[in-house]
Amino acid sequence: MIDFSILLEAYFDCRRHKRKTVGATEFEMNYMSNLVQLLDEINSRQYKIGKSICFVVRYPRYREVFAGQFRDRIIHHYIALRLEPLFESQFSDRTYNCRKGKGQLAGIRQLQEDIMEVSENYTEDAYVMGIDLKGFFMSIYKPLLAKMVDDFIVRNYHGDDKEDLRWLCNMVVMHHPEKDCEKKSADYLWEFLPKEKSLFTNGEDRGVAIGNLFAQLFANFLLSKLDWKIDYYCKHHVRYVDDMVLVARRKETLLRLMPMIRETLASLGLRLNEKKFYFQHYSKGVRFVGAIIKRDRIYSVNNTINNFRKSVRKLNDAARYGDIEAISHAIQSVNSYLGIFGHYNEYGMKRQIIKEELDEEAWKFFVIKGHYRSVQLKKRYNIDMKYKNMANEILNHKTEERKDIPTENEISKMLDKGYELEMYIIDGRIHVECYPRDS
């Protein structure tokens, strides 16, 4: 049986950084009684996963995301607290996503060091092979993953709540959120998703919901089998989710690995994305998780630079109208990019774009800190924003609703596909209906 203290720990872990969300606030109002009820449901095997919300995000590409209720997310954190330490002891050091002390930047630095080591400080030839998986999260076969996780728990977990953990893991892995969900995005947005990219259309028992904590944890666990097989034949390799790069002195070393990689993936119900495969000399540069690694230097990919330019333009537009709230939001976006660029060799690019895109009048609202490390709203406007935000939080209760106003590009694509869009307003909210032209 699960002890109350364990569930309480999972609750505090779950609400961290999420305390102001509607679900967390409602649960916290009576969190002790809510936790007791949840505990009783689990121990009596009456617990059932609740309705999820589902929406489509547009940036950086169209993706379907599911989010469980807050009480269900507590269960996800309970599972992670129990299994993550055990998984960590068996993960390869060459896996960098969603792990403490790792991360995207650490993976990029490791790959740079690997290239330097294999090429003997850029004095010898070295080759890189990049591979990606096709529709990774949506291709995961649930029964196989559930069995692998259950076998792992049987062998490695020895807590008093072992049977509860097995029962809950099987439930969350085999759950079909698409069968009981509330769509927060307009239906027409699903038209931009390929069938294999949605749980609604990719086939029975295929896919785990992007957006839930356990998805990343169990995905790492699933691919750890491939990590260790690659590690046996090729010491220098890095993986971030389903993006992998291998480095070797000779071409043949890398090419001989392809049959083994395909065979291992097939045993897991996965396959390579042939369109994203590349094989080249290190001197041509290596693209990995949003960065271009070249000799002694790391750059951002063009998409990131273009998006940074767009964020600076939005800041300039907000400053032109003197909208302090819009300026504050735009500054957050600009600073997120400046934070990324601070780790790369991009000082000249940052300086050039900011100077090109910001009007002279815009500078009265903010200042640049350090060597283009961040943008900061001037103090007198910051104070105004503080009190305005306090008033808005009182007057307007925050919700999890999302804006689904179609962009001009989306409208054009839907019309080309033979659909018609009808937009109308109910209770001050914009609604969009999409239907075939012949209906």
Where are these regions (language model features)?
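Non-catalytic, polymerase-adjacent accessory regions of viral genome-replication enzymes
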Residues: 1-36, 379-382, 387-389
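Acidic, low-complexity, intrinsically disordered interaction modules
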Residues: 399, 406-407, 418, 423-426
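Amphipathic alpha-helical blocks
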Residues: 28-51
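Short linear proline/tyrosine/threonine-rich motifs used for host-factor recruitment
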Residues: 394, 421-423, 430-436
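Conserved polymerase palm-domain catalytic core
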Residues: 41, 114, 119-241, 246-262, ...
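Right-hand nucleic-acid polymerase module
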Residues: 68-69, 77, 189, 194-205, ...
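Active-site-proximal segment of RNA-dependent polymerases
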Residues: 80-141
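Short, conserved non-catalytic motifs in the polymerase core
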Residues: 17-25, 50-74, 90-102, 176, ...
